[in-house]
Amino acid sequence: MLDKKKLDVYGPKNNINGINKIVSELNHFNIIGINFEVIEMPGHTLDHIGFYSFNDGSPILFCGDTLFAGGCGRIFEGTYEQMHRALNKISKLPKNTKIYCGHEYTLSNLKFAIEVEPNNEKLKDEYVNVQRLLSFDKPSLPSTLEKELNINPFLRCHIPSVQNKINEKFNTIGDEIEIFTALRKWKDSF
């Protein structure tokens, strides 16, 4: 497709086939009248980036495999600390930000999240809602940052119910990065 049409393909400085517009943190670009800002989000991979737009008061974030509805990406090249920092960066965006992630893993992520926070009513309600949507072949995405802050355990490592569950399961007490690391490793084997 790139051979036939002149398309701009934005991406990090890496040897990724097809990228012809290299961007990094705080770079801006415009596509079809929408201004985007680049946010570096290492963790899943070392050069992972996202595209954020305030979009006239209706903010959107394309975050690839950093944040998923109800979960987050695996750590392939980066570190747990980098991923935790990237998720914290996302959590500071406006609460009405629509989250467009790279995959529809919502239902399995919510099953895990319920294991972590079985008494989280908003989480249980979202699980039922996603089951219903998927039963009608409807996507559960995009999510919103406000929703994720209420249901996503990877954005809730500072919440006592998440900390207590990790401490109970792994007999450890740690800071948020240690909680996040234990949580991500648990999800890897869930």
Regions found by a protein language model. Give the residues of each.
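Catalytic core of the metallo-beta-lactamase
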Residues: 20-117, 176, 187
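Prokaryotic Sec-type signal peptides and long signal-anchor helices
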Residues: 4-5, 66-69, 158, 184
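Accessory terminal helices/loops
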Residues: 88-98, 107-190
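Short N-terminal secondary-structure initiator segments
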Residues: 2-3, 11-12, 83, 99-101, ...
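Residues at the C-termini of beta-strands that transition into short coil/loop
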Residues: 13, 42, 149
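Homeobox/homeodomain signature
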Residues: 8-13, 19, 35, 57-58, ...
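Active-site HxH/HxHxD metal-binding segment of metal-dependent hydrolases
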Residues: 1-37, 59, 125, 129
